[in-house]
Structure formats: C-alpha cells, structure tokens
Amino acid sequence: WTWDPVAKAWYWHRFFSHQPDLNYDNPAVLEAVFKTMRFWLDMGVDGFRLDAIPYLIERDGTSNENLRETHTVIKAIRARIEANYPGRLLLAEANMWPEDVREYFGDDDECHMAYHFPLMPRMYMAIAQEDRFPITDILRQTPEIPAHCQWAIFLRNHDELTLEMVTDRERDYLWNYYAADRRARINLGIRRRLAPLMERDRRRVELLNSLLLSMPGTPTLYYGDEIGMGDNIYLGDRDGVRTPMQWSIDRNGGFSRADPASLVLPPIMDPLYGYLSVNVETQAGDPHSLLNWTRRMLAVRKQSQAFGRGTLKMLS
C-alpha cells in the first residue's frame, strides 16, 4: 500500500508504486479500459500484451493470483475486441508453468496467445550443456491448446532473462555460465542481450535462433537481436537492454535526430556493439550479415506450416 497525498488515500499496487492496481469490479473502470483500448485499436495497433495478467483481480484472503474473476474480465475484453476489431490479438504474459498458463486461452475465448516462459531458459541450458533434455522435457509438459491459439516463444525480451522457472541448482548453473560478471544479474535473472550472452559467437547466435524458429509456436524476436545489438551493463535496472534501435551510422544510430542528452536512454557507442559497428543499414547491404541470415531463415520458416503449426515427435 502507498499513500497518495493528492487523493489523501491509500492505494494498492502489486508491483511498483507508479503502477497502481485498478478496481476491475467497478464497471466504470472496465469501461475506461475499453475506451483506452479503442483509442489504440483505432490507431491501428494489432493487439495488446496483457502484462502480469494473473494478478488482475484482488480478493481478501487470497494470493490475488489466477482468480476466477480474472478470466471473466479477459473474456469480456476478448468479446469486445472480437465484436468491433476482428483480427486483433491478446497476448498473455503469465510467468507460470504451461499447464497453468493453459487456462488463459480459455475455450478459445480469452487470449489468442501466451508466452511460454519455461521453454526460454531451457534453450540456453541445452546449448550450454550440449544436451537436448531440457528442451524435450519441457515440451513434453506443454499441454494442447485450442486450435486457434498459439504459444509465443522467445529468446529475449525487454526484461531480464528470467530464471524464475528453473530449480535453484539450474539457476546457479546458468548464472555461472552466462553471467559470471555479477553486474549482469538482477532479481532472478540476467540483464543481457542475446549477442553478449553468446559472447558475440555468430554460430551460437544462429544455433539458438534456429532452435527458436523451428519450435512449436510463434517466434517473438526482440528488436535489435536480428543485427546482434549489444547492451549497456552500466545502466540501472533493466534499462541496459532497452537502448535505442541502431538503424544507421547517423546521429543516435538513426533512431532520433534529437539532442542525445534528451533521449530517455543513450545509444550504445562502444567499439564492439556501438551503432557505428552494428546497424541495420550496414548489414542490409551485406549478404552474409546476421540481419540477412535472419531474413533468409524467416523466409524458410514461412514456406512450410509444419514450423510452428505442425506436430512434434521426439526421437529417442
């Protein structure tokens, strides 16, 4: 709870104090949320990521997680979108085991997609151990989902590489392997981008992306990873992996013409990962670049619905 001196009242927040929880039991609040969604949908956005969706509703005497009433709200949002904006998408962010996340698809009447969090660290584990078991084991634990729903699979995103869904022993192994520099560790994860995690080893970057693009589900690429962008470990919290996209060698990496001091975060300028060395414009003109390799892999994937939509059989 945090005191608001303007309202002269306390308010509840599950996470940061600048993220107050809304009272979805109040119909006026839900209508205000619908109004905000309509604004962005009318602007042309393709969908919404429902952040930390398991904690939407609060009830006294509970952990306020995965409550039945949360699913009621999601169904209402889905119905409103389907009726007025067909073809738009709801993506659930629920950092839980696959069998628990399954509930957020409903009967094809809640979220269209959901992140598969436990798969992500196990791809890194498989590469480090040169063993397929971490991947095959979690895929065996992944339940069937409605025909028109899909898992969103990923290697990195705007947060830390979360190790919440592994054992303490596995977490220590991954920390020691990928984050020997303790500055890279945050919460229960690692605050590095893909290329630094792979120590700029192009073959390992390609191997991980090949795994991602051939898994059941829809691959979700984090901006900049397609060109091997680095991070800024000296920035606080998770900001090190949220630096401006590096489009060219122009000012601020082509991201903005503004005074660099006015940017929310500074562009990367070091010799290895800075925008003078790593950018879209340069790689677009190089047929052997990571960007063009990624484009070719995506083209191959799109040629067959077996990738992502096909069935998967484990070979012993």
Regions found by a protein language model. Name each.
Residues W1-S316:
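Active-site and adjacent substrate-binding regions of carbohydrate-active enzymes
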